[in-house]
From Swiss-Prot:
Glycans are attached at residue 133. The gene is Dagla. It is a multi-pass membrane protein. One of its GO terms (biological process) is arachidonate metabolic process. It comes from the Eukaryota. This is Diacylglycerol lipase-alpha. Belongs to the AB hydrolase superfamily. Lipase family. It is an enzyme of class 3 (hydrolase). Interacts (via C-terminal) with CAMK2A; leading to the phosphorylation and inhibition of DAGLA enzymatic activity. Interacts (via PPXXF motif) with HOMER1 and HOMER2; this interaction is required for DAGLA membrane localization. The keyword Membrane applies. It comes from Rattus norvegicus.
Amino acid sequence: MPGIVVFRRRWSVGSDDLVLPAIFLFLLHTTWFVILSVVLFGLVYNPHEACSLNLVDHGRGYLGILLSCMIAEMAIIWLSMRGGILYTEPRDSMQYVLYVRLAILVIEFIYAIVGIVWLTQYYTSCNDLTAKNVTLGMVVCNWVVILSVCITVLCVFDPTGRTFVKLRATKRRQRNLRTYNLRHRLEEGQATSWSRRLKVFLCCTRTKDSQSDAYSEIAYLFAEFFRDLDIVPSDIIAGLVLLRQRQRAKRNAVLDEANNDILAFLSGMPVTRNTKYLDLKNSHEMLRYKEVCYYMLFALAAYGWPMYLMRKPTCGLCQLARSCSCCLCPARPRFAPGVTIEEDNCCGCNAIAIRRHFLDENMTAVDIVYTSCHDAVYETPFYVAVDHDKKKVVISIRGTLSPKDALTDLTGDAERLPVEGHRGTWLGHKGMVLSAEYIKKKLEQEMVLSQAFGRDLGRGTKHYGLIVVGHSLGAGTAAILSFLLRPQYPTLKCFAYSPPGGLLSEDAMEYSKEFVTAVVLGKDLVPRIGLSQLEGFRRQLLDVLQRSTKPKWRIIVGATKCIPKSELPEDQVEVTALASTRLWTHPSDLTIALSASTPLYPPGRIIHVVHNHPAEQCCCCEQEEPTYFAIWGDNKAFNEVIISPAMLHEHLPYVVMEGLNKVLENYNKGKTALLSAAKVMVSPTEVDLTPELIFQQQPLPTGPPLPTGLALELPATEHRNSSVRSKSQSEMSLEGFSEGRLLSPVAAASAARQDPVELLLLSTQERLAAELQSRRAPLATMESLSDTESLYSFDSRRSSGFRSIRGSPSLHAVLERDEGHLFYIDPAIPEENPSLSSRTELLAADSLSKHSQDTQPLEAALGSGGVTPERPPSAANDEEEAAGGSEGGGVAPRGELALHNGRLGDSPSPQVLEFAEFIDSLFNLDSKSSSFQDLYCMMVPESPTSDYTEGPKSPSQQEILLRAQFEPNLVPKPPRLFAGSAEPSSGISLSPSFPLSSSGELMDLTPTGLSSQECLATDKIRTSTPTGHGASPTKQDDLVISAR
């Protein structure tokens, strides 16, 4: 809330900040009230002892003071818990209660003095031990409370409080010259106050001219940032809590919408179909990423002994102590003669820590040439090393580690880069521009780079490349230093880890992409803050505070894990409804524009390491580790501060190092994005979730031939997609899905004796129940995607009712041929509308299985009636019975799909109807999809005289059928991107429901034994054809549905 006004002065504390202090004092005074009451009325005192009589009189008076304090503190607690952050009207009487409490405090002060007098007179002579101890406790407690109140008053004292009250009173009446003068005095007073605070914060440092200038610039920056804002520090804390809740609510609302391209949020960043992932399967991309991880070790070593001990708190101290000689053995050589160390401590701990860091990482080929530990404002420590393994000279700049570094960070005005020969104006962060100029000057004066490149001419150091690295402040300084050194070293490369957001202007940022690679981890705060970003953050903070109607204590307490979360203020709350109660600010104060600052952005090409957030487990269950992914970030996308408990933790250098390594670990474990998404997302499609289908090529087993319908023998006709699916197994791990396996002859024969549709229904129903039990919370996970992989169906736009169960059983479609090898396909969850998708697939399976069973025995019945070598006797007998029934003119039972003169009947089988109802009961929650009978009529011609191969006649039926293929739920959606629309470098290929070849073309998955008309009924049953298998044109393919 606005600062409370007491004694006609504004204080840096709000009336709703007094809840906890009042509760603490109330409990303390209640405890002493009980103790003193027991001592006074429960004990018998000697009437002849003067000390006892004085104690009784003093105690009774103090009981009255304690009772008054308890009443006043209860009133303070009650008033502080009323109203909202900016709704101060219910707390208007707080100042009068404080006047009463301060008057009681004065009386307490008098009684504390009396207690000291009593102790000096009677403490040694009084024989009543209880009286002496109680009096001593009361006096000590009183003085502790009094001193605490005095310290608190000094902390919340605002030097500009009187001017602020006058300015507010003047603005209420009119705007005139007096208002301008008061505002000017207020800004100057606030700048002076901030400067004094900075000097107190850096009281142990020696002040130089540059440091004094930094004090002034930062003080004016803070004064301007907080000008006209009548808020207190606790309001900022509550605002951060509310802002985090609002950001999370907005992300959930975006995911629930159906008319946007955002698929998920990873580390607060939106993931769309255009998101570019690092293609780690590409050798060049993998080499580049490993190079980024490698040089992070150099940036980490620049922090010296503090970071070394932080990473290795146990054995690190022993390692340093063994190498340090300190001042006891100055003659002991610790470094090579060619190593220059500047301003290290007496033990040389920083230089030793840098060397130990490389030794611990087995980087023995790294030689330290120069180490500067000099630390001042605009003068950042750095070191230069020669890496003989990589044939590079490395300049590593330290990040923020001292208060002086913080001053350099806070000097964030735009400064012109001292680089000539370019078009436009290149601007950079002032503090880091000055630091880069200092390092460049130091390198030239000490001829450090000449020493490095001439370190070992026999090993070719003269032709080594130059690398500049840094983290945080060092990252920004390294990027700007690269601008300064690039004219002399055109092949220079820079790696900036967690660089500041307000670093380079747009022109300079675009140019830096040629030689700078930046790394950002998760929700790191630093790459998202600059002057322009802070202005937006300021507006968001004020807006969320203005909309809040909850008490501050409830908001802050609700942010803890042990207390239920506070309610998020609704956006529909009319701000004007409380305008009369918010007289603390002028109407234009919330919309004032800060001084126009040039937008600055992070440098180079940004690798954004993001990760998912697994659902929190109970205390007895093991927490699932998050999965890390690397994507290419947009420099202009880091324009909003994402409030999170991890926003500071993910900026630490060793945490960044761990994040980079976890991307490689997840990739090596095969945790790819699409398959992880298949486990947790709510509406994946069949092909998009399995871009790399597993093909297991196994020889035919010795023994009886497999029955019809249990194995898939793909024809040898060469297709255009055969080159990408010829591997025995994909590089991707299909975790969460059972692998395709070859049935044994015995199991195959037993399965063949059952009705294929019944086998399908039983197996699929059991598999579906197990799959629904294993479903996890819907949270997007994704990793490295290549050009051939698709994320189209990775759709996070879901409603709350579909977050637990959406998907349908995997139907295993196989074809059988006579010769060749066997390939098994393990499909995944079908398309977005599970009820419709599975019923269409089931219908096609049922229709074609009956069709294949009834049409194939015709040749055998017309021939000799013998059993062909390719078919088992049982299958031949079934075919004979079917053929005989057909010849005899028998009528098929009602509910079966029988073949009459080459035409299908118009009603599905009972098994199909039963399973369709089961699917509807699970998935058809919204009742928007077509009914099963409608689908059946759409797949099977209504007229008994029409030929089966003709398909739908009217254009409307054709349109419905096509939309049933591509849009299963028949609901209009935004235009979809297909295979050719994604950029090759994006790492994601998009398709409606088809897999892609390595060239980005749609793969032809039509079985060669079926006609184009028959494929209309089998559009959901997709297979792919490897190279080298041909089809016999004279034989009819058998299509049987098999479920595992």
